[in-house]
Amino acid sequence: MMMSCRNIDLGTSVLDHSCSSSSTSRRFLFGNSSKTVCMIGGRSCVGNLVFLRRDLATCRAVPAKSKENSLVNGIGQDQTVMLNLRQESRKPISLETLFEVVADDLQRLNDNLLSIVGAENPVLISAAEQIFSAGGKRMRPGLVFLVSRATAELAGLKELTVEHRRLGEIIEMIHTASLIHDDVLDESDMRRGRETVHELFGTRVAVLAGDFMFAQASWYLANLENLEVIKLISQVIKDFASGEIKQASSLFDCDVKLDDYMLKSYYKTASLVAASTKGAAIFSKVESKVAEQMYQFGKNLGLSFQVVDDILDFTQSTEQLGKPAANDLAKGNITAPVIFALENEPRLREIIESEFCEPGSLEEAIEIVRNRGGIKKAQELAKEKAELALKNLNCLPRSGFRSALEDMVMFNLERID
């Protein structure tokens, strides 16, 4: 099926579109509004464009008028923007292909991780090795390197600095420390399909291992000698504690509001991602408004990821998750799908507030969340945050690194397709 697109009005910009594709188009968000009129198989179709995807099918979009815009607006005078349409038959995005453009950076990080933890205590090293080798995605340092290289291009840097690389290592150490402590607090036996540190070595060693990694990361952070980044990352460690306290104080509480959930999700997940992306931009010495957009990108991406994770807790199996399915609900943690399902299901409130005391009540609650709108509304929330994250990237010049950041947003959403 052939598709052709004609001139479209995107609010402040009129773009001339010419493209061909053997597939249906996906939506792409451009500025505040976007409409397209396409001829698909001789039929005129009008729709909103929401998402960007790299693919074999591409459209070349050129501003009809030369207009000088700021970096935050993302399109400078006489720049050409490549809008890419997704082929439905295309293989899903994988982190391996997404991070290909920073594969060497990630390999150097993997080689350095154990050495920078230190060799003072063999037990702590064994604990760190257990989680470092547990198939982690290295998503956060990957984001550090992608933003570092995307903003380095903007600032005219030809190579990453020592500070960029050290930041990636610090971020992964902090993330790993938080996982060790999370597993202790949640009494989790499995993570990524492997036994957790506290299951293998005991709670005492796990707590000390997490503390040690936080301390070691803080020492390396101080040696970066950048006060802005030190404050930024230090706030993340504080946010971790705030998030855990907020979660522990609201278990089985069906009056938790969506704003409370989003704040807790920011503390526990998005704060670190936002600090990672902003810190990378700071070390590239870009303008403060670009660094702030990178912070907002990390925040919105992190929130979208957390919402998707909470959806998968209801839609995937224990084998797929690498941990017990519906584990959060079983422990009374009220997440986005549950909050939305509670809006119209008094029976769900009754079950949760009873703390699943009746046989089969947990399974009943899971079915209510799955089938009564909780999942659908949570998906909409994840997409809303993803759209904002894509807009935050408009301050970056077109490059393979920016495309990979956009694909990261889409990779997350593909997990719930």
Swiss-Prot record:
A Gene Ontology BP annotation from the UniProt entry: plastoquinone biosynthetic process
EC top class, as a word: transferase
Cysteine disulfide partners in this protein: none
UniProt key word Transit peptide: yes
Protein name in UniProt: Solanesyl diphosphate synthase 2, chloroplastic
Binding residue positions for an all-trans-polyprenyl diphosphate: 191, 268-269, 306, 323
Compartment(s) where it occurs, according to its Swiss-Prot or TrEMBL record: Plastid, Chloroplast
Organism annotation: Arabidopsis thaliana
Subunit structure, as described in the record: Homodimer. Interacts with FBN5.
GO molecular function: all-trans-nonaprenyl-diphosphate synthase (geranylgeranyl-diphosphate specific) activity; metal ion binding
Family membership: Belongs to the FPP/GGPP synthase family.
Chief localization: plastid
Record's function text: Involved in providing solanesyl diphosphate for plastoquinone-9 (PQ-9) formation in plastids. Catalyzes the elongation of the prenyl side chain of PQ-9 in plastids. Contributes to the biosynthesis of plastochromanol-8 (PC-8) in plastids. Does not contribute to the synthesis of tocopherol or ubiquinone. PQ-9 and PC-8 are lipophilic antioxidants that act as protectant against photooxidative stress under high light stress conditions. Prefers geranylgeranyl diphosphate to farnesyl diphosphate as substrate. No activity with geranyl diphosphate or dimethylallyl diphosphate as substrate.
Traits of the deletion mutant: Reduced growth. Decreased levels of plastoquinone-9 (PQ-9) and complete loss of plastochromanol-8 (PC-8) in leaves. Severe increase of photoinhibition at high light intensity. The double mutants sps1 and sps2 exhibit an albino phenotype and are devoided of both PQ-9 and PC-8 in cotyledons.
Cofactors, names only: Mg(2+)
Reported tissue expression: Higher expression in leaves than in roots.
